Amino acid sequence: MSAPTPLASTIMIIRHAEKPPVPPAAPPPFGVTPDGTQDDRSLSVRGWQRAGALVSFFIPSRPVPSSIKAPQFIYAVKVDGDDEKPRDAVGIRIGTKGKRAQQTIAPIAEKLGPTATLNFAFDKGDEAAMIASAMACPGPVLICWVHENIPRIASQIPVNSSTPVPESWPADAQGNGRFDVVWLFEFDPAANTYRFSHIPQNLLAGDLPE
């Protein structure tokens, strides 16, 4: 039996935004919740800057790469929650694991409002099921995930052999996984596969140009 034809016209994958050092360091940068509470499981200040800047990247009021689309469906890795912990302003449990991906897309989701469908049901390790769900979405999809597992997601996407996907998430000069790129997959109905490209965000000072 042949695989079903994907419905998602565009799939855009990003890593969550910047985080504090691991293990948490005594000096800054610290992780902070949206209300400014120190929390090493949250984004750093630079991470929140990127999360805000991504709104205009994906929902532009100015020209951006034409291949970038305003997402209609947004996936972020499931938060490892603890029902006894309080929620922050975004509605995520304070002190829980995995929240940075949801924090990264929160400003985008707020801007889009009810026009976007959010899915936080899939955990790390559920990449195959998650991308199968994403490819069945009838419109542009944005996925925010932990960078170590993004190649697992990409490996499940049928990609044109002329645009192969790297085996690992790109690193900066220090060997750390980059925060400033988008992996873009555009569906080619004639080939029933996706064309892959690597798009730099170029949002913050220090972002790499390619």
Predicted regions and their residues:
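Active-site-proximal alpha-helix that buttresses catalytic centers in soluble enzyme cores
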Residues: 3-138, 149-210
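Short beta-strand segments
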Residues: 144-146
